[in-house]
């Protein structure tokens, strides 16, 4: 059950709309601000896909949706919000302007999460003159309404209490919060993806394989292993009865071989862009983006549902969380009164802690 009653979403693109969908489908009221005149239509399209996926997850009926309001200003959107998620484009100057306005108008005890995929929170906090201590990075993965991972990163001015409250908030809407121990650009997930992306660009550019062949190598091979065990546990099993030490002794030396070009970046010229875009068009076989999104969502639900039945019915990995989340949604759907009142009761029992500025040390 969520510990927030009203949320605000600043930015309604793919990620922002995904946050809106997850929050609304958990019965939480959301006020959104996005200057794009097409924002309402785009959010509506994402909501259609999210509702469809959630109906598969909870066939017995979904909770009463939260109310969605389109605000005319950031100030209007964040008024009375317990939780604010910023999802504007990845430009530091824009982040500064938006966060400064959020900070000026949001309640002092509201947690502010940023969806940035690479900017350090310390670099964003400088724009927040009132309460920089309540800003955390809350980096999700697309589609936000289905993929549970959220990377939480604190900056130099972030209070530890803010990180703890952020963890509770994200967990309450069915997510898997992972706190990154040290502040670093691009955090963890995107750093791994960038390394694979760079090497993939070289493989396509050099004609080693096509984009479809590369994707097949991932989805028919190690991608299936990663989805349920990650990287290190897969390698532990690959080491046999001797485990990880044997694996590292056997395969560690190959890291010295010059197999990859991970530190080099191919020139992103028109020729490479055209090559990849053309092959990607061929790979789609005429399917639209919306059709591909539907296939993606159906597959994700099926994978998580399958994993939820493993480990003697307790669920495994993302499946264990999926099992608990679908139970939570079903329980919320069966509850009376409506979800917003239930969230208010939860908030009253465990309020979001109000941030306090550290006391200045006395001179002398």
UniProtKB/Swiss-Prot annotation:
Identify the pathway: Amine and polyamine metabolism; carnitine metabolism
Which reaction does this chain catalyze? Answer: carnitine + NAD(+) = 3-dehydrocarnitine + NADH + H(+)
Q: Which UniProt keywords apply?
A: Cytoplasm, NAD, Oxidoreductase
Q: Which GO terms describe its biological process?
A: carnitine metabolic process; catabolic process; fatty acid metabolic process
Which class of enzymes does this protein belong to?
oxidoreductase
Q: Which residues bind NAD(+)?
A: 11-16
Q: What is its EC number?
A: 1.1.1.108
User: Can you provide one Gene Ontology molecular function annotated for this UniProt record?
Assistant: carnitine 3-dehydrogenase activity
One GO cellular component, as annotated? cytoplasm
Task: List every stretch annotated Disordered.
Answer: 336-364
Pfam families per record: 3HCDH, 3HCDH_N
Q: What is its main location?
A: cytoplasm
NCBIfam families per UniProt: PRK07531.1
Q: Main role?
A: Catalyzes the NAD(+)-dependent oxidation of L-carnitine to 3-dehydrocarnitine.
Q: Assembly and partners? A: Homodimer.
Q: Which HAMAP family has this protein been placed in?
A: L_carnitine_dehydrog
Stated name of the protein? L-carnitine dehydrogenase
